[in-house]
Amino acid sequence: MLSLWAIGLLGLLNQVEALWSPSSYQSPAQQRSAQFSSSGWGTSPAAQNPWSFNRPMPNTNMPNMNTGSLPGSMPGAMPGSMPGAMPGSMPGAMPGSMPGSMPGSMPNAMPGAMPGGTGSGFMAGAMPGAMPNMRSSNNMMGNMRNGYPPSYMTPSPRNTICVAPVSQPRLCMVNGENTHKYRLKDVIEFLGHPNIEKVPKCVPGVPRVNCADYYAAQYIWKRGYCYCKNFHSNLPSYQMGSTQIRCVLNNCGACSQEFYVDKQRVVKCE
């Protein structure tokens, strides 16, 4: 009697277990065995070494791995970035630097260069070999390159400095008494060099070139050492400080032009 009651109790327990347990239940060991066999993990003839990459790795479908990244990239990395690099940076570059540049420098610039510069140590917009807003000394031979001195600004109502010869007119503001006359020899002596064409500097103290001396006037005109080009006596006066200086161009017939400034004040031509 007791045995029949025990058998009935076991049957009831089996029915309850069948109701609460799904028919497709598998133990963790059974799940891993079935997963590896379906992926081909156990079919390789090589030794079953989990660190041997001569066989395909099992598809474990781990969450949050390689989400949105390229194949082979690290988890959470930007597409195409190297492991350990900042997002979007190039391999081997400093964080935040541009490709091909020195660490911390601007793109396409030499180390220490300012943006827009052309090389190391140059300010923005400066040309190679010249510093911005720098004027040479009385003799500009030291700054000449390929026979041409650096170009300076042309005269304007508020800027009455000398400009480089050859390409731009040069204005020397000198004593305007208009009484002295100089020959070519005198002009050369003022320049301080026998070859007037190779000394690009002004002639301080030369108020007027003698129009009768054709060659002197032509040298002054062509080489631009001390002259006013395309100015006439009716033009407005130039302003330099509190002194108005007007450049006068006179036509002296068949020989050439004469040039002077009609103020009785010597202004240094730099």
Swiss-Prot record:
Localization per record: Secreted
Alphabetical keyword list: Secreted, Signal
Biased composition, class Low complexity, residue ranges: 56-95
Range of residues in the leader sequence: 1-18
Biased composition (Polar residues): 31-52
Chain residue ranges for the region called Disordered: 31-95
Free-text tissue specificity from the UniProt record: Component of the acid-soluble organic matrix of calcified layers of the shell (at protein level).
GO cellular component terms listed in the entry, alphabetical order: extracellular region
Protein name according to UniProt: Methionine-rich protein
